[in-house]
């Protein structure tokens, strides 16, 4: 089991995941999002090669209406 | 010369608009089109994990290929949170460095926390961001932000979302007269005449959201704002006549009157 804290909530995943794998599981493939892992940006170019570890804290953000 | 230039890029429109508080993305887009704005602000927020991921995205309605997207740090109360948010925004927008920094100090009046704003601006400029900064209408701190390297300084006209208009035109004049970067009034405009007054004072542009989004007819107000900005800019460039406080001066000839 892989426990990840995503956008402030702990979620469990059955097996090892890369950032690309996580994005796929969340249904965000092809969406305009950005990912921060443990306080550091994970650039899109590194999504496929960044392996997630238990306890990782992730922020996944999107653009919304605002002034 | 009559264009607004920010960080080396020229814009035809001096009206910058937000995308918050609209009924839906269709209304957002219609209002932006009516406003003629080229620079459009967005906020950065967490995705709703577990909710329908196929929901429409704001950036589909306002594509970065057609607009200059200006991500903001609305809701941030510390320099660290603002910097983190804009690093995410830059990643989201494929490295686009232009951003709107705002670090708030009080949730009831949304006044900026200037020490944190100055701190965040220093970090962001060092990291290569092109920072447009929401700030207090304090001429000294506006100059400090310019000296840090912000590409535009954006003092409030009155409180965010208040629609109270230009409450301190004299401070704005001091800021404008002393500036080497564009000064853009950000926040407080309520109607088209407020935007005109800001431009007549010599502001380089106006950024607004609520005045359009919360008008009864947002699209019509967006059009009015476009005209208000243009009228104010032209009046500023034309140079207004001197005020005469104690004497009238007839517009028609004083000679050749019948019966004289």
Model-derived segments and spans:
Chain A
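Ubiquitin-like/PB1-type beta-grasp interaction modules and other compact soluble beta-rich domains
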Residues: 1-66
